[in-house]
């Protein structure tokens, strides 16, 4: 019995590692998006407590720009919607990656089982 790993199994192992790295990258992106969404929700909550004629400032790059409450609320709601859509997309990608990972694991088990016989 040869201890050398067949090229097909090596290829499947490489694919499995790649899928695992993709899953880790997606998890990091998801955490970042969730954090950004939480911050935006908290900001919106605080904004809604202010009077309608309140002057607010919002960050634009390195600057703080004076704005009115309504414009800032609208921008935050738009940002929240965008973040929610991105999170949904990432969740779908995670599901696909998870299925692919399971599929590759099964293929590897079968390949290793037939190799050992």
UniProtKB/Swiss-Prot annotation:
SUPFAM superfamilies, sorted: Prefoldin
Principal location: cytoplasm
InterPro entries: PFD_beta-like, PfdB, Prefoldin
UniProt GO molecular function: protein-folding chaperone binding; unfolded protein binding
GO annotations of cellular component type: cytoplasm; prefoldin complex
GO biological process: chaperone-mediated protein complex assembly; protein folding
Compartments where located: Cytoplasm
Domain of life where this protein originates: Archaea
Keywords: Chaperone, Cytoplasm
Pfam families xrefs: Prefoldin_2 (PF01920)
Similarity-based family: Belongs to the prefoldin subunit beta family.
Biological role: Molecular chaperone capable of stabilizing a range of proteins. Seems to fulfill an ATP-independent, HSP70-like function in archaeal de novo protein folding.
Subunit comment: Heterohexamer of two alpha and four beta subunits.
Name of protein: Prefoldin subunit beta
Organism: Methanococcoides burtonii (strain DSM 6242 / NBRC 107633 / OCM 468 / ACE-M)
């Amino acid at each position: 019995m040869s201890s050398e790993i067949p090229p097909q199994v090596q290829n499947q192992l490489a694919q499995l590692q790649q899928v695992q790295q993709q899953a880790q990258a997606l998890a990091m992106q998801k955490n970042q998006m969730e954090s950004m969404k939480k911050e935006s929700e908290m900001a919106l909550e605080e904004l809604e407590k202010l009077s309608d004629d309140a002057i607010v400032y919002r960050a634009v790059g390195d600057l703080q720009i004076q704005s009115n409450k309504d414009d800032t609320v609208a921008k935050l709601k738009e940002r929240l919607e965008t973040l929610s859509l991105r999170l949904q997309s990432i969740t779908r990608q995670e599901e696909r990656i998870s299925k692919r990972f399971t599929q590759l694991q099964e293929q590897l088990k079968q390949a290793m089982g037939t190799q050992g016989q």
